[in-house]
Amino acid sequence: MNNKKDYYLPFLLTAIVIVVDQVTKILVVQYMSVNEVIPVIGDLVNLRFVYNTGAAFSLGAGFGEIARKILLVFLPFLLLIALTGAYLKSAELTRAQRWFICGILGGGFGNLIDRFFRSEGVVDFIDVKFFGILGMERWPTFNAADSFIVCCGIGLGVNLILQGIKQKKLKDS
């Protein structure tokens, strides 16, 4: 990529995601009690303060302390460093792909900050009704970092699929 602004500007999103994630978590910890529920949109969306000692859906919460540190701190840290390195080395990424990757990085580093500095676990607080889909009445509680990881991950996946379709059409014509 020739334009340095297009190359480095997406890291601003990484910083914004980290700030939004940490500020929302600080507010939840300061103004809510653990397990407190505050309805936001009826029963559809609640604020529910919980600490998550596992990964997504609390996976790994029952692991021993050393296993949790390796699987939930060390490995994610290495993956985020590898993703950052791939971003910095690749000239093939599109502008959109760079923004999506930086959103994922922001969410990943936001949750890692909790794992490093909150012994209780990652602060989760967004609780959404799931209407019994997949046998779940409510989706597992999550946070702003998780939202950015999922939304940017989906955006990146869709972008890569569309790019592949476009390249195939160009190759076939």
Swiss-Prot record:
Protein topology in the membrane: Multi-pass membrane protein
Compartments, as annotated in UniProt: Cell inner membrane
One GO term of the biological process aspect: proteolysis
Signal peptide: none
The enzyme's E.C. designation: 3.4.23.36
Reported function: This protein specifically catalyzes the removal of signal peptides from prolipoproteins.
Name of this protein: Lipoprotein signal peptidase
Species per Swiss-Prot/TrEMBL record: Treponema denticola (strain ATCC 35405 / DSM 14222 / CIP 103919 / JCM 8153 / KCTC 15104)
